[in-house]
Swiss-Prot record:
Residues 711-727 have a biased composition (Pro residues). This is Cyclin-T1. It comes from Bos taurus. It holds the Pfam family Cyclin_N. The histidine-rich domain (HRD) region is intrinsically disordered and promotes the formation of phase-separated liquid droplets that enhance binding of the P-TEFb complex to the CTD (C-terminal domain) of the large subunit of RNA polymerase II (RNA Pol II). The lineage of its organism: Eukaryota, Metazoa, Chordata, Craniata, Vertebrata. Belongs to the cyclin family. Cyclin C subfamily. GO terms for cellular component: cyclin/CDK positive transcription elongation factor complex; cytosol; nucleus; P-TEFb complex. The modification ADP-ribosylserine is found at residues 417, 475, 532, 550, 553, 564. ADP-ribosylation on serine residues by PARP1 in response to DNA damage disrupts the phase separation activity of CCNT1, thereby preventing activation of CDK9. A motif (Nuclear localization signal) lies at residues 253-270. The keyword Transcription applies. There is a cross-link at residues 343, 416, 482 (Glycyl lysine isopeptide (Lys-Gly) (interchain with G-Cter in SUMO2)). InterPro entries: Cyclin-like_dom (IPR013763), Cyclin-like_sf (IPR036915), Cyclin/Ssn8 (IPR043198), CYCLIN_CCNT1_rpt2 (IPR047320), Cyclin_N (IPR006671).
Length: 727
């Protein structure tokens, strides 16, 4: 039984003399015309198979049926456009992908008559087509002797490339050669699939300047595939393959616009269902487009070795490639566009292994084959069948291929830049929403004047603190951060600002000898963190305002120091009296209201000094740049929102708020791992004070305190117990 099967298989391999004496030749067709008819029939089968969504295995099987059929029958008796649909209809059933007869007829009509409308299924013409196709199918079956199982060279290509551990580029190139051998040559009628596979691998090696080494036992790689193969046979068939490519008509080298049609159909379907995925799909499309451009660029480039080639390609020797790729891709590209080889049918013996090795090449090459090869339509011209060496072939097309390579590289660069731009936009759009919003009501919210304040709507702080977890936020330097606080106040508020400046000056003088300094002790915890971290110029806060003292020191450890925002906004309100605020902590804290000359102050932070750099906290602040006239400085995501800020905060019950503030600050410091300790007392930072109110007398008094800091007074009464920590 096995011997009988081998004899039957030999029946379908023909010598050159038999090919030259085929039925079509006997009916008057010249050799080139017959080969052209075979190529056009294979082209039609490829197009129909893609439209019917059958696997490439099914299409290849139908092409072999067609080649064998025309070794028994003539093209003059059975037109290729009639045989092709019947062969595909039969192959689909053999490969377990049956298609409805109606669909096959409609697809064939669309491919052959794209301008005409589809026939009515009840019309006489349609019924006649159905009858003709069924009859042709039975004729093909009888002509083939019901030998329907086909062995393809692809199986052997994959096995051999795996055996010799060939590079991915070499495997892909060899695989495409096997497909093109079916489309463009009669090798399937002359040589067994293992021999054809060796020819394809040999041609791919020449193409990519790659040489498969001899095995350890001294055998060449092709001896493991087929013992009858010799190097002379491989060179002869490679030369014949190149000659066929050289004289293949240009119209068969063009890529059918299958990808555009498929993309248009997919776009319509996607529009019905998935608008929400549009942005993600755009990025994915750009990525796939970029990868396909890279592949095509690799195909068109001359590489020294396929192992060093960076892109999957039909590597490089563009010489032979220009022609071969034209037609080769005519077949491989077009079928890949609609059949990414993910569909592996149970009966697809060779495709299961092919998919593992070559799915990347198939999918990437499917996408932009048309761009690469439409431009090659004029590259090769029909020439007499004189022998052309591989070097001559390369030299002939080197210039054209260099131009195509440049064009494809430009296209690849454009696609990559578009992808980068789109990705950057998505990332920036995402980052713009990753912020934490803190609404901080400023004291005076229980002020009797609240109805008036609610009219102004904009005197509470709403701060948007950018998240520091991302790379962008982490890379921002403190000195690059500017702050903007825009306080919209009425005219009477500016009057109150001036009053507060005067009161603060008087209060500072009184406060130096004030007997109730025991409140210093309570404020030490709340001021410790901000004093130790902020530069000298940032110490001018209204620390007597309990809310501000807590908020300033709570946020002082962040790279975006928000303390300036509180000094600016607090300066727009009158200074509370010492007995109401619990006696402000340090002398420098009483100077805060001097910043009220403008509703905001523009400055950028220098690198934060350490405690060692701040002896007595009166160090030089020349590193700070103040710009008094600027009233619109910028702070990231900081807004002013509703909620009241009292123009007069005298009547607010401050004792409870103050204690709550101290407790909250201590809990936050403990959470950060900082143990609050008493810092050395110091005078207010003189640089900023002189900037607002230059006085000669202040210099002498400060100079004495700089070197010898004054110790803080002891509390006259113990602090009250702390309430539980806030959640």
């Amino acid at each position: 039984m096995e011997g009988e099967r081998k004899n039957n298989n030999k029946r379908w391999y023909f010598t050159r003399e038999q090919l030259e004496n085929s039925p079509s030749r006997r009916f008057g067709l010249d050799p080139d015309k017959e080969l052209s008819n075979r190529q056009q029939a294979a082209n039609l089968l490829q197009d129909m198979g893609q439209r019917l969504n059958v696997s490439q295995l099914t299409i290849n099987t139908a092409i072999v049926y067609m080649h064998r059929f025309y070794m028994i029958q003539s093209f003059t008796q059975f037109h290729r456009n009639s045989v092709a649909p019947a062969a595909l209809f039969l192959a689909a059933k053999v490969e377990e992908q049956p298609k409805k007869l109606e669909h096959v007829i409609k697809v064939a009509h669309t491919c052959l008559h794209p301008q005409e409308s589809l026939p009515d299924t009840r019309s006489e013409a349609y019924l006649q087509q159905v009858q003709d196709l069924v009859i042709l199918e039975s004729i093909i079956l009888q002509t083939l002797g019901f030998e329907l199982t086909i062995d393809h060279p692809h199986t052997h290509v994959v096995k051999c490339t795996q055996l010799v551990r060939a590079s991915k580029d070499l495997a892909q190139t060899s695989y495409f050669m096997a497909t093109n051998s079916l489309h463009l040559t009669t090798f399937s009628l002359q040589y067994t699939p293992p021999v054809v596979a060796c020819v394809c691998i040999h041609l791919a090696c020449k193409w990519s300047n790659w040489e498969i080494p001899v095995s350890t036992d001294g055998k060449h790689w092709w001896e493991y595939v087929d013992a009858t193969v010799t190097l002379e046979l491989l060179d002869e068939l490679t030369h014949e393959f190149l000659q066929i490519l050289e004289k293949t008509p240009n119209r068969l080298k063009r890529i059918w616009n299958w990808r555009a049609w498929q993309a248009d159909r997919k776009t319509k379907a996607d529009d019905r269902g998935a608008d929400e995925n549009s942005s993600e799909q755009t990025i994915l499309n750009m990525i796939s487009q970029s990868s396909s451009d890279t592949t095509i660029a690799g195909l068109m480039s001359m590489s020294a070795s396929s192992t060093t080639s960076a892109v999957p390609s039909l590597p490089a020797t563009e010489d032979s490639k220009s022609n071969l790729s034209n037609v080769e891709m005519l077949s491989s590209e077009r079928w890949l566009s609609s059949h990414p080889p993910f569909k592996v049918e149970p009966a697809q013996g060779y495709r299961k292994s092919e998919n593992l090795a070559l799915v990347g090449a198939d999918h990437s090459l499917q996408q932009d084959g048309s761009n690469a090869f439409v431009s090659q339509k004029q590259n090769s011209k029909s020439v007499p069948s004189a022998k052309v060496s591989l070097k001559e072939y390369r030299a002939k097309h080197a210039e054209e291929l260099a131009a195509q390579k440049r064009q494809l590289e430009n296209m690849e660069a454009n696609v990559k830049s578009q992808y980068a731009y789109a990705a950057q936009n998505l990332l920036s759009h995402h980052d713009s929403h990753s912020s934490v919003i803190l609404k901080m009501p400023i004291e005076g919210s229980e002020n009797p004047e609240r109805p008036f304040l609610e009219k102004t709507d904009k005197t509470a702080l709403k701060m948007r603190i950018p998240m520091t977890g991302g790379d962008k936020a982490a890379s921002i330097k403190p000195e690059e951060i500017k702050m903007r606080i825009k306080v919209h106040t009425a005219a009477d508020k500016h009057n109150s600002v001036d009053d507060s400046v005067t009161k603060n000056r008087e209060h500072k003088e009184k406060h130096k000898t004030h007997p109730s300094n025991h409140h210093h002790h309570h404020n030490h915890h709340s001021h410790k963190h901000s004093h130790s971290q902020l530069p000298a110029g940032t110490g001018n806060k209204r620390l007597g305002d309990p809310k501000h003292s807590s908020q300033t020191s709570t946020l002082a450890h962040k790279p975006y120091s928000l303390s300036s925002s509180f000094s600016s906004s607090s300066s727009s309100r009158k200074r509370p009296l010492p007995e109401e605020t619990g006696g402000v902590a340090y002398d420098h804290s009483t100077k805060t209201a001097k910043s009220a000359k403008s509703s905001s102050i523009n400055f950028s932070f220098p690198p934060l000094p350490t405690m060692a750099q701040l002896p007595g906290h009166s160090s030089d602040t020349s590193g700070l740049h103040f710009s008094q006239p600027s009233c619109k400085t910028r702070v990231p995501h900081m807004k002013l929102d509703k909620s009241s800020t009292g123009a007069n905060s005298h009547n607010t019950p401050q004792t409870t708020d103050y204690q709550d503030t101290v407790n909250m600050l201590n809990s936050l410091l403990n959470a950060q791992g900082v143990q609050p300790t008493q810092p050395p007392a110091f005078e207010y930072v003189h640089s900023y004070g002189e900037y607002m109110n230059p006085r000669a007398g202040g210099m002498s008094s400060r100079s004495g305190n700089t070197d010898k800091p004054r110790p803080p007074p002891l509390p006259s009464e113990p602090p009250p117990p702390l309430p539980p920590l806030p959640k």
